[in-house]
């Protein structure tokens, strides 16, 4: 193993992490926009109903 291998591997790993965080952030923003649109249309998230006697 050479120094260059470790350097390139670390740059590659950093690039993968950066891409993963970018995709995750993009997907989360998209999901939040979809939820906001549903709530604006009057559709709310389902909540579990309480059982009788509990």
Curated annotation (Swiss-Prot):
Belongs to the CcmD/CycX/HelD family. Required for the export of heme to the periplasm for the biogenesis of c-type cytochromes. The keyword Transmembrane helix applies. It is found in: Cell inner membrane. The chain crosses the membrane at residues 7-24. One of its GO terms (biological process) is heme transport. GO terms for cellular component: plasma membrane. Keywords: Cell inner membrane, Cell membrane, Cytochrome c-type biogenesis, Membrane, Transmembrane, Transmembrane helix, Transport. The lineage of its organism: Bacteria, Pseudomonadati, Pseudomonadota, Alphaproteobacteria, Hyphomicrobiales. InterPro entries: Haem_export_protD_CcmD. This is Heme exporter protein D. It is a single-pass membrane protein.
């Amino acid at each position: 193993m050479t120094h260059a291998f470790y350097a390139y591997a670390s740059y590659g790993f950093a690039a993968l992490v950066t891409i993963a965080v970018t995709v995750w952030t993009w997907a989360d923003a998209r999901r939040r926009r979809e939820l906001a649109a549903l709530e604006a249309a009057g559709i709310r998230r389902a909540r579990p109903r309480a059982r009788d006697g509990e």
